């Protein structure tokens, strides 16, 4: 309830004061920046920079391009239809003499710092290589941090295709990234510009969904209907009861469900409720977070 919010807010205020003390004015300015931030992530040489360059080329507006002093990521501002987007590129500097493992480790560290600063991550995969273990590892970084997610299969123009290629590729990606079924999937080419306008549309949609709020009344209707359709599990004669659901925050949308017994609320039933909410609101491209709280029966 509200007391929880207030308590959390106080805690957060103190924490922010501490943080600001250490970082001075600049850190705060970055926090207040409301522009959508998109991290372009992926293993080396999949075409991350070419995508940004191509997007820049299409719009011909470079608002700013300031190389980060302390980090390798370079922020590029692109203006489109009156909205400014900040693209965070994790390509970084190539050091020729570094060993492969070291480059991989650095690229993971860079990915983490970029992902932490973004709302939406675009994972770029090389169509000519298919989805690899390193791709799934990088995707996990964004998933764990609750970011909006788009998978862009690049160099789509460079592979031999028949009528089944896209279907097969889609199945492969979905299977390897089965923990993020919410991710949007696009097949693009930075080289030819194929579907790059669609990438922007998808970014807009995912940003909107990532900060979408659903009214409590509506959520409880959806939950009541879900419970009526599919009886909650019981254990040793005790049945799970779901009392109430409410959305507590966004980026990603986060919900609290009050139940009689947390132990009875299995992962699979939470997933079922999530699917019902997604059926109603889509929430494409964004993870949803659920917190289960116990309320003793009166």
State where each predicted segment sits.
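C-terminal-of-GTPase-core extension/linker across diverse P-loop GTPases
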Residues: 2-88, 96-109, 113, 117-124, ...
């Amino acid at each position: 309830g509200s007391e929880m919010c207030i308590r959390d807010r106080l805690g957060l205020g103190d924490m922010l004061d501490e943080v600001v003390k250490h970082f001075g004015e600049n850190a705060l300015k970055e926090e207040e920046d409301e522009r959508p931030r998109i991290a372009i992530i992926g293993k080396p040489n999949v075409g991350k920079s070419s995508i940004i360059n191509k997007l820049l080329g299409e719009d011909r507006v470079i608002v700013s391009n300031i190389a980060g002093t302390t980090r390798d990521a370079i922020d590029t501002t692109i203006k489109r239809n009156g909205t400014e987007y900040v693209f965070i590129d994790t390509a970084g500097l190539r050091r020729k003499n570094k060993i492969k493992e070291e480059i991989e480790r650095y690229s993971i560290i860079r990915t983490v710092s970029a992902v932490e600063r973004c709302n939406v991550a675009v994972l770029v995969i090389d169509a000519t290589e298919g989805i690899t273990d390193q791709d799934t590892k990088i995707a996990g970084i964004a998933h764990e941090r609750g970011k909006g997610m788009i998978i862009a299969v690049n160099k789509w123009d460079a592979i031999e295709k028949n009528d089944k290629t896209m279907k097969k590729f889609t199945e492969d990606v979905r299977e390897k990234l089965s923990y993020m079924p919410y991710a949007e999937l696009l097949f693009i080419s930075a080289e030819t510009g194929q579907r790059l306008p669609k990438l922007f549309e998808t970014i807009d949609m995912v940003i909107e969904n990532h900060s979408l709020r659903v009214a409590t009344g509506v959520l409880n209707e959806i939950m009541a209907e879900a419970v009526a359709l599919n009886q909650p599990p019981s254990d040793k004669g005790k049945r799970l009861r779901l009392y109430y659901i409410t959305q507590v925050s966004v980026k990603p949308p986060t919900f609290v469900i009050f139940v009689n017994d947390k132990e009875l609320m299995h992962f699979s039933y939470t997933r079922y409720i999530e699917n019902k909410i997604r059926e109603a609101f889509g929430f494409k491209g964004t993870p949803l977070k659920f917190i289960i709280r116990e309320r003793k029966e009166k």
